[in-house]
Amino acid sequence: GIVSPPLLLTAIPFDMGDIIISLGIIGPLAAIVAILFMRLVLFTGTIPAKINIKNWQAPIIAGFACGICGMIFSEVLGLGTDVLMSVITTQLLFGYLFALLLGKLILTSICIGFGFFGGLFSPALFLGGVLGAIIFQLPVTAANPDLLSVLAVSGMAAVSSSVIGAPLTAIILVLELTGSYEYAIA
């Protein structure tokens, strides 16, 4: 059968001049989010040893944190593909987006730091998409509602390329995820 991209987005016409300021804001903020994410993962990895938690207990504590968080704010659990698609296509409130960013950042760091198996790439995409949607809320970009998806996808590429250390790979992955050349070059 035919396989469609996970984040199939219709290409929208946009002028690069309309988003250049926003992209200039996303770049440094994406670097800050990526550095914070990586440092938080490393820091939480040291906590179990510092407070004498046994290796078998650490994942139980992380699972308990996931369970509590899941009852309160389930959007930050798992891969977050559905939430990410909503972030990319729907204008959400700033406070909600900020809560998604902080929640995913903290919960992923706890889970990986406390011994859950998982990667950093998918959470980095999530964090970047949410960051791009937050940048869209700024007055400099909010004039054109079509730019939400462009900025969210740009944020995904920026944060994930910083986390995995491979910017060209991130561009190719955005092309694969969205099926859109226009989004990949943005």
Where in this protein do the model-derived segments appear?
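Alpha-helical transmembrane segments and immediately membrane-proximal extracytoplasmic
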Residues: 1-186
